[in-house]
Design a protein with these regions (language model features):
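Alpha-helical transmembrane segments and their immediate juxtamembrane interface regions
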Residues: 73-79, 84, 91, 306-339
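Select subsegments of transmembrane alpha-helices in polytopic membrane proteins
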Residues: 41-49, 204, 280-294
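Membrane-helix cytosolic exit motif
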Residues: 239-247, 251, 326-330, 334
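Cytosolic, membrane-interface loops and tails of multi-pass inner-membrane proteins
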Residues: 17-42, 243-281
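"…together with the soluble PPM/PP2C metallo-phosphatase catalytic core" -> "…together
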Residues: 1-238
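Extended hydrophobic-aromatic, low-complexity segments
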Residues: 223-228, 245, 257-258, 311-314
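Transmembrane helix-loop junctions in multi-pass membrane proteins
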Residues: 192-193, 218-221, 243, 302-308
Length: 339
């Protein structure tokens, strides 16, 4: 792992230096939510390295269908990063079409939910496929939502992969690939902390897709793990998106364009307004750390009851309540300043 990390560091440093010199892969702040988060110059090369590792693994394992699946999703994100595919509604449609195709071809299904009536429904392949597509679409786009703050998404998935590596050692999954990705994310995080390298839409899409499919596999091959522990591992990016959808619907806002009313953005604004650090990178780091430390705390508790569905449900419910309370409080405090 250490050797790989050193290699990744120098590769990213070299690519970043070239991009900085020639302004390749420069992230253009053309939306309100991006300008709100930061005006700093950064480069969306993180996703390329994730795609490189995953592509190499799929070719080596001769999983060409999975490789094509990941690269198709990656390309949609890459076109968005280059501002060649700016319509969020159209991007979502293309994502869903790809998910429909590959979920069916690769026979990707959600396993038991431990709710009898739901499991009976999931015996119908069509219903199961549709629910799987919905879950993956929410995870992919929710992850892209929270990636607006540096370190937040990368650190979140470092936590998820770290828990798999260090606490779920007896599960039959590709630990070599997971270890490599874990090492890569740690190195990307170093550059991301200083606002130099970001994942971009392409990186957020492909990373979250990998996490989602890995967790589905994890649940499928280990009946002792509660499926709600799997949900708990990805609850935050998913709920950020679901809550935003509900909020917009309740406010009669039907735009697909991103806004600055998400919880992570409110936390960042509170830090900006109250702590007044000159370093925008420090503000991002603190905002991301607050959210991730809370999630790490909850997940450490969950590890002790990994097969207890009732406790997993209680923790998920607790997360939702905490999220809503904090959101309402911050919304009231920031309301006079919000446009």
């Amino acid at each position: 792992m250490i050797t790989n990390s050193i290699i990744y560091f120098f590769l990213i440093f070299i690519v970043f230096s070239v991009c900085k010199k020639f302004n390749f892969f420069l992230d253009i702040k053309d939306h309100k939510h991006k300008k709100f988060a930061s005006n700093q110059t950064n480069y969306f090369i993180g996703g390329f390295f994730i795609a490189l590792i995953l592509t190499y693994n799929f070719v080596e394992q001769k999983d060409y269908s999975y490789g094509l699946f990941f690269m198709s999703i990656f390309i949609i994100g890459l076109l968005a990063d280059f501002k060649l595919f700016n319509n969020p509604k159209l991007r979502l449609i293309f994502q869903i079409l790809l998910l429909i195709l590959f979920v069916y071809v690769l026979d990707i299904k959600i396993p038991s939910t431990r709710i009898e009536i739901v499991d009976i429904l999931f015996e119908n392949n069509l219903i199961n496929y549709l629910f799987t597509i919905f879950c993956l679409a929410i995870l992919i786009n929710g992850s892209n939502f929270v990636d607006g703050i540096n370190t937040l998404l990368i650190n979140y998935y470092i936590i998820v992969l770290g828990l798999i590596i260090f606490f779920l050692k007896d599960v039959n999954i590709d630990y070599y690939l997971i270890n490599n990705l874990f090492s890569l994310l740690l190195i990307i995080l170093i550059f991301n902390v200083f606002g130099q390298v970001i994942l971009g839409d392409s990186g957020a899409y492909i990373l979250s897709l990998f996490i989602g499919l890995t967790l589905i596999d994890l649940s499928n091959i280990n009946n002792l793990i509660s499926p709600y522990f799997i949900i708990l591992l990805v609850w935050y990016p998913c709920f950020e998106l679901l809550f935003s959808m509900i909020r917009r619907f309740a406010s009669n806002i039907y735009s697909y364009e991103p806004d600055t009313m998400h919880l992570h953005q409110m936390i960042l604004k509170m830090i900006n307004d109250n702590l007044k650090f000159k370093s925008n990178n420090l503000n991002h780091f603190l905002a991301g750390s607050i959210i991730n430390l809370y999630n790490l705390f909850i997940l450490i508790i969950a590890l002790n009851y990994i097969n207890k569905t009732n406790i997993m449900l209680m923790l998920i419910f607790t997360n939702i309540i905490v999220y809503i309370i904090i959101y309402v409080v911050l919304h009231q405090k920031l309301k006079p300043n919000q446009s």
